[in-house]
């Protein structure tokens, strides 16, 4: 289980390592382009959602405990990037099977 820390430790949010590794790539790419966006994460206990305004001026940490074992699914990255660029911001969508829906990669 990884941790996303937004601004300060009091704003820590647990996210599974695989999902967090993919979110990290999306956040990194969006901020590299100076494109702030809303990130919505579901509470693990099912009690609702938390929304974070992702912007270059806010310090963030991504603590991924098993990063060496996470294989990146480029199709999932592309799907998450599309969501982050949409009107509702970035929310975690189910991971697509790379082999069922092969598409040309948009990431270079």
PLM features per residue range, with description:
Residues 1, 24-28, 39-40:
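Intrinsically disordered, low-complexity boundary segments flanking structured domains
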Residues 1-16:
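Short, extreme N-terminal segment that most often corresponds to the first beta-strand
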Residues 6, 30-32, 43:
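Sterically constrained small-residue positions within well-ordered secondary structures
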Residues 9, 18, 42-44:
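Histidine- and/or cysteine-centered catalytic micro-motif in compact active-site loops
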Residues 17-31:
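Charged, amphipathic alpha-helical segments
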Residues 30, 34-38, 87, 91:
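Short secondary-structure junctions and interdomain/linker hinges
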Residues 35-69:
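Short, structured protein-protein interaction patches enriched in aromatics and acidic/basic residues
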Residues 67-108:
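Mixed-charge, glycine-accented linear interaction segment located at domain edges/termini
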């Amino acid at each position: 289980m990884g941790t996303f820390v937004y601004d300060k430790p009091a704003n820590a949010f647990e996210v599974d390592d695989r999902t967090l590794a993919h979110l990290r790539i999306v956040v990194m790419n969006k901020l590299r382009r100076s494109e702030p966006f809303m990130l919505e994460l579901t509470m693990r206990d099912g009690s609702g959602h938390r929304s974070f305004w992702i912007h270059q001026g806010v310090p963030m940490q991504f603590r991924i405990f098993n990063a060496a074992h996470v294989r990146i699914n480029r199709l999932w990255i592309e799907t998450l990037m599309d969501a982050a660029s949409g009107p509702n911001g970035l929310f975690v969508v189910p991971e697509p099977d790379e082999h069922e829906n092969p598409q040309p990669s948009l990431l270079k």
